[in-house]
Amino acid sequence: MGKALIIGAGGVAGVVIHKCCQNSEVFTEICIASRTKSKCDKFKEELQDKTATKITTAQVDANDVDQLIALIEQEKPDIVINVALPYQDLTIMDACLATKTDYVDTANYEPEDTAKFEYKWQWAYRERFKKAGITALLGSGFDPGVTGVFCAYAQKHYFDEINYIDILDCNGGDHGYPFATNFNPEINIREVSAKGSYIENGEWVETEPMEIKREYNFDQVGEKDMYLLHHEELESLALNIKGIKRIRFFMTFSQSYLTHLKCLENVGMTSIEPIMFEGKEIVPLQFLKAVLPDPASLGPRTVGKTNIGCICQGVKDGKPVNYYVYNVCDHQECYKEVGSQAVSYTTGVPAMIGAMLVMTGKWKKPGVYNVEEFDPDPFMDALNKWGLPWTENFDPVLVD
């Protein structure tokens, strides 16, 4: 069918690469590009003899638009799958615009010098992508991504309007370290150290970090503490789902994780303000990232399961409806299949699916879109096929 250029070579990229290689009918060729080409070459060595997909590799600095344009012009992909850093979304989108190439990512843009992420920077590309006749699919990971598709599916099949959405992200995995993050430490710590927020009656309500805590009993995981965070899909779902009065996002954290994080905050290690150290300027959080375990190395030692889903409350034919749709993913099963833990797996599989739907024309439309703006059915079918089966509950325990 076609060729994908995959930018990035971390844990999520590894899953995308494996899944594209499993889906050779659609992805007849992939080029893996990263700042460190040796990482890309490792994937090629591991997979080339096991797949019909042709694999090439390249070196690129994703902060450099000219380098990106040159690479896209050289490789001529049908689509670019961006699994680099969120700071690099706009340079990659600029390169896609210049070369008229479709684009998919898993997380919205945030400036490197400000711990704030929102869609406004990427939504500003709408007219330019439309004019160029190309598609940008934003946030095709799990959350954001599958969570948006879950809500669109609920809206299409079970509701006339959805008034309340709670997105619950539970990681019941244990990697055995006193402190480590399941995805890029810099991005993860910025996210959980920031103020929380949710949308109520069209307005953002801000909370202190970890101020709002709830307990929830997750299927196949058990009772966990979860905390309200700011999360990017709230912004798009509030616009795209009919009838929304309130939308919140909760994520589980262990007491050990929170204690370590608080200690690191107290000594300044989570700061993104540059400091001078032995004549060099360093960012404490970037230094911390360098000494923490690489999330891509956690796969073999992580046991347990994730459970991520959406609880929707609303109305159908004048009657109240409650609906919970979620996926449970086993860390060790993911490792056996693609060599990663479930957090990378649950992000990487939907990135491949989103790219597949754009490439095959099912989700191909000029402009910039979030996942919930397309027909959810082909995506939901693909989740079952490609390793993220989902479960429905029509009588869920609600979050107060």
Give each language-model segment a name.
Residues 4-11:
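Conserved N-terminal Rossmann-fold NAD(P)-binding element of oxidoreductases
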Residues 156-400:
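C-terminal catalytic/substrate-binding lobe primarily of soluble NAD(P)-dependent oxidoreductases
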Residues 36-39:
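Helix N-cap at the beta1-alpha1 junction of Rossmann-like dinucleotide-binding domains, i.e.
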Residues 107-134:
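Rossmann-fold NAD(P)-binding glycine/threonine-rich loop
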Residues 61-77, 88:
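Conserved Rossmann-fold cofactor-binding substructure of NAD(P)-dependent oxidoreductases
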Residues 49-64:
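Rossmann-fold cofactor-recognition segment
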Residues 72, 78-82, 103-104:
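N-terminal Rossmann-like NAD(P) cofactor-binding module of classical short-chain dehydrogenase/reductase
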Residues 13-17:
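N-terminal Rossmann-fold NAD(P) dinucleotide-binding loop
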